């Protein structure tokens, strides 16, 4: 008699057991898929933070959990979103108080980005903004210093909304502010929670050394 190690179902022949695929076995076979791995990572983090579990959850715990499907679904969302500061995003979602089945929400991620960029240090914001500009230049066969001169308004809207171009950067560059003026009303409404003029005016006033750092980088890089 041959028994499935996952569902404990008995089979008379080994060949029948080999082709048998129960739900737990299917989950086990998919353990190396990217979205499953992401879901498993978040599952472990959830029990560490929310349940204050001292014992690290295993993959066997994961595939037998009633929450497996929900975590894998979020794993797909996480992998596709490619969030900035991934660990911070996971912790943010877990501590948000939002129910697990509602984690795959663009609105929740937008809220995370909007709050995050107002808190992060200027140097991290600068590095990510320049990286985004370089990626754009590689795609367009251009130079990254010309990003604000030639970027498509839709692309600029996306990059700001996703936190890829920070207000630390765009609001301290003349061509950046000019690029914002090319956005239409709908696009301005989309980037509004990120480009919060009153907030950033106070921020720049309170952190003059960071503003000077940005201006030095702009001057040295000859951003146009």
Regions found by a protein language model. Give the residues of each.
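Long, mid-chain structured domain cores
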Residues: 107-177, 182-183
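Surface-exposed polar/charged interaction patches
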Residues: 46-49, 53, 77-84, 95-99, ...
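Charged, amphipathic alpha-helical linkers/stalks
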Residues: 29-72
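Charge-dense, extended regions
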Residues: 149-224
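Short, low-complexity intrinsically disordered segments
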Residues: 29, 45, 101, 134, ...
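Charged/polar, solvent-exposed surface patches and flexible loops
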Residues: 19, 23, 41, 45-49, ...
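C-terminal recognition-helix end and immediately following basic linker
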Residues: 1-40
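Extended alpha-helical scaffolding regions
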Residues: 59-137
């Amino acid at each position: 008699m041959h028994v499935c190690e996952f569902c404990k179902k008995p089979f008379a022949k080994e060949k029948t057991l080999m082709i048998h695929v129960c739900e737990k076995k299917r989950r086990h076979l998919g353990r190396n898929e990217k979205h499953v791995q992401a879901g498993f990572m978040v599952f472990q983090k959830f029990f560490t933070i929310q349940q204050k579990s001292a014992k690290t959850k295993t993959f066997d715990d994961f595939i037998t959990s009633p929450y497996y499907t929900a975590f894998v679904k979020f794993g797909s969302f996480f992998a596709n979103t490619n969030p900035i500061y991934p660990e911070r995003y996971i912790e943010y979602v877990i501590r948000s108080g939002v129910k697990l089945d509602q984690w795959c929400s663009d609105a929740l991620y937008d809220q995370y980005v909007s709050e995050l960029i107002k808190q992060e240090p200027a140097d991290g914001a600068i590095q990510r903004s320049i990286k985004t500009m370089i990626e754009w230049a590689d795609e367009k066969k251009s130079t990254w210093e010309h990003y604000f001169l030639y970027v498509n308004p839709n692309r600029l809207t996306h990059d700001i909304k996703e936190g890829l171009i920070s207000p630390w950067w765009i609001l301290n560059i003349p061509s950046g502010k000019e690029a914002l003026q090319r956005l239409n009303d709908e696009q301005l409404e989309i980037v509004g929670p990120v480009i919060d003029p009153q907030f950033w005016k106070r921020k720049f006033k309170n952190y003059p050394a960071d503003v000077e750092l940005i201006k030095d980088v702009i001057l040295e890089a000859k951003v146009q």
